[in-house]
């Protein structure tokens, strides 16, 4: 029974990492498409849009990194 709980923790950690990576990829894709759409509509605002794009992209990309840390905690410290 103990072995089953450890296996479930590993599966939970894998699901956490996978879903966060998929969510971040979708978010960055949508963010990039909206950036290109905004740059095409108003080319004079490209420097401002680019700055905001990279700030938000960094925040979106931080979510999978935090999830990797949490999943490693679940795998190694919870048991």
Curated annotation (Swiss-Prot):
Site (Reversibly protonated during proton transport): 61
Main location: membrane
SUPFAM superfamilies: F1F0 ATP synthase subunit C
Pfam families tied to this protein: ATP-synt_C (PF00137)
Key word Ion transport present: yes
Entry annotated with the keyword Disulfide bond: no
Membrane topology: Multi-pass membrane protein
This protein's GO CC annotations: plasma membrane; proton-transporting ATP synthase complex; proton-transporting two-sector ATPase complex, proton-transporting domain
Physiological role: F(1)F(0) ATP synthase produces ATP from ADP in the presence of a proton or sodium gradient. F-type ATPases consist of two structural domains, F(1) containing the extramembraneous catalytic core and F(0) containing the membrane proton channel, linked together by a central stalk and a peripheral stalk. During catalysis, ATP synthesis in the catalytic domain of F(1) is coupled via a rotary mechanism of the central stalk subunits to proton translocation.
Name the UniProt record assigns to this protein: ATP synthase subunit c
Organism expressing this protein natively: Blochmanniella floridana
């Amino acid at each position: 029974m103990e072995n089953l709980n450890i296996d479930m923790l590993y599966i939970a950690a894998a699901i956490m990492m996978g879903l966060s990576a998929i969510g971040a990829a979708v978010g960055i894709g949508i963010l990039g498409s909206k950036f290109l759409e905004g740059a095409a509509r108003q080319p004079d605002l490209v420097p401002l849009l680019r700055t905001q794009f990279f700030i938000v992209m960094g925040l979106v990309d931080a979510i999978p990194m935090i999830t990797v840390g949490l999943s490693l905690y679940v795998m190694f410290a919870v048991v």
